[in-house]
Design a protein with these regions (language model features):
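Conserved NTP-binding catalytic cores of kinases and kinase-like/nucleotidyltransferase enzymes
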Residues: 1-140, 259-262, 266, 290-299
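Active-site-adjacent bridging/hinge elements
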Residues: 45, 86, 142-158, 252-258, ...
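Secondary-structure capping and boundary motifs in well-ordered enzyme cores
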Residues: 59-60, 135, 171, 270, ...
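ATP-binding pocket architecture of kinase catalytic cores
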Residues: 78-106, 114-213
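Active-site activation/catalytic loop segments of kinase-like enzymes and analogous catalytic loops
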Residues: 110, 114, 306-350
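ATP-dependent phospho-/nucleotidyl transfer catalytic cores
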Residues: 152-279, 290-294
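Catalytic activation segment of kinase domains across protein kinase-like and atypical kinase folds
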Residues: 207-209, 274-276, 283-322
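Helix-rich C-terminal or lid/interface subdomains of diverse kinases
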Residues: 342-366
Length: 366
């Protein structure tokens, strides 16, 4: 049954169950909705139910949608049935700018079924319910909540703050290893074709919502603002990036690259040897880390919005784009290029990363 505030509920395309579009709707649906959702998703038996919501709080952050952390109780405790939950909504009904990114989560929801198959090679938060309504762009995802700093899991690390993270190179090695395992498993054909076929190659889809390209006048204003910022805060940027020569070249190159956006996307899509299913935004803040008895650092990944087949240069850049400049170069050289043989493969990986970076940032620079 649709909730009491109908504009906050939609009927899902996958299960045909009405689900809330935001935290207000979820709170109104309460334990009844959670019971129905977990049953229809197959994680809760008909003889079991959600009996209590012990914790319910909104979580700030992220570029799209609203988020909730919850703790629930069940009538019967069952192994593998999680009580600490994290809820993601694609919509932000109170913020039109954030709501524009609502399409980002559709692949995330479709990814739920694939992530549960035994052949899936890396750790992801276990999905207890996921559905979407394509027509309105409304999606909902309920997963286990990863408790950072508890039971062997390291604390949460923020992107762009590598200097606060112990052994950053080891962490990026673990992160890139996870990406490589997923890409390799997909290309080997070990994942169910019926599920991977739901993620066709679409280079243009790897972005947060629909961002309108900047006009030449607006782009020129951005460059002027950037130059003023560099002049005012020179210590915040590496010396070579803040030099007048670099800024002049940037002002000349970015419009030219943006003009060839479709050519760049075509080149990324055409290089079939480097295409695979992968995480598009595997920054360090979308990962969690732990060590096993072998003392090897392991990595799990969350926030699978825009997941799909892509050029691996895009995936690697998505993982490294928040790293310190020197760490980015070191991690790519150590973990990607020095492991490639022959050298032509290493060169191709570097080229793909550069093209992926250009295609991501030059068409719609922040």
């Amino acid at each position: 049954m649709i909730g009491p505030e109908n504009h906050r509920w939609v009927v899902g395309d996958q299960f045909g169950l009405a689900f809330p579009a935001d935290p207000v709707g979820l709170r109104s649906g309460g334990t009844r909705f959670l019971t129905d959702a977990f049953r229809v998703a197959g994680v809760l038996g008909d003889d079991n139910s959600v009996t209590r919501i012990k914790e319910f709080r909104e979580v700030a952050g992220g570029s799209t949608g609203r988020k909730v952390a919850m703790e629930v109780e069940y009538d019967k405790a069952v192994a593998g049935l999680h009580t600490d939950l994290f809820v993601k909504f694609s919509r932000d009904l109170d913020n039109p700018i954030r709501d524009r990114g609502r399409t980002q989560m559709e692949p995330d929801v479709r990814f739920a079924s694939l992530s549960r198959v035994p052949e899936f090679p890396i750790a992801v938060p276990y999905v207890q319910f996921a559905d979407y309504q394509h027509r309105s762009g409304t999606r909902m995802l309920i997963t286990e909540r990863i408790r950072y700093g508890d039971k062997g899991i390291e604390r949460h690390y923020h992107k762009c703050l590598d200097y606060e993270m112990p052994e950053p190179l080891d962490h990026y090695r673990a992160l890139l290893t996870a990406l490589a395992r997923l890409a390799g498993t997909h290309r080997s054909g070990c994942l169910p074709a019926g599920l991977t076929s739901r993620f066709p190659l679409d280079v243009a889809a790897a972005t947060v919502g629909d961002r309108a390209p900047l006009s030449p006048d607006k782009l020129e204003r951005r460059f002027t603002q950037l130059a003023e910022f560099v002049a005012t805060h020179p210590a915040l940027l590496p010396a070579n990036v803040g030099s007048p020569e670099f800024l002049a070249r940037l002002r000349e190159d970015v419009p030219r690259i943006a003009h060839h956006e479709h050519t760049i996307a075509g080149q990324l899509a055409a290089d079939s040897d480097y295409l695979a299913l992968c995480h598009w935004n595997a920054n360090i803040d979308n990962a969690w880390f732990w060590r096993r008895g072998d003392d090897v650092l392991h990595c799990g990944l969350m926030d699978w919005g825009c997941v799909g087949q892509m050029n691996m240069g895009m995936a690697i850049w998505g993982a490294m784009s928040g790293a310190e400049t020197d760490m980015c170069g070191t991690a790519i050289s150590t973990n990607c290029c020095t492991c490639s043989s022959p050298k032509s493969i290493a060169a191709a990986v570097r080229t793909s990363i550069r093209i992926g970076c250009a295609g991501t940032h030059c068409s719609t620079p922040p």
